[in-house]
């Protein structure tokens, strides 16, 4: 697991990074000044349909709404999910947050490279 420092983020952890013949995938948790962002990235490989388009499905959580939940606890929760058994991490994260009455924003971005 990598942890990187950048100007607009306090912390960034790559939870999972993989690829197959179709695409590359990465699941990332970032801590910014006032929010925590979980994102799942998908980038199709050359020769595949939609090559050149990347997707990011995300969940944004305001730090002020986190109650007693910490970044490290959220990271541990996400790392302990087996995405193959559970159909991914995103829906389980949303259920986890709703169960604790922690509001969040979610969505899907796509862009052309």
Tell me what each language-model feature is:
Residues 5:
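Extended, Lys/Arg-enriched charged tracts that mediate electrostatic binding to polyanionic substrates
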Residues 9-40:
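Amphipathic, interaction-prone secondary-structure segments
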Residues 43-48:
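Short, surface-exposed beta-strand-loop junctions and turns on beta-sheet-rich folds
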Residues 49-113:
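Mixed-charge, Lys/Arg-enriched low-complexity segments
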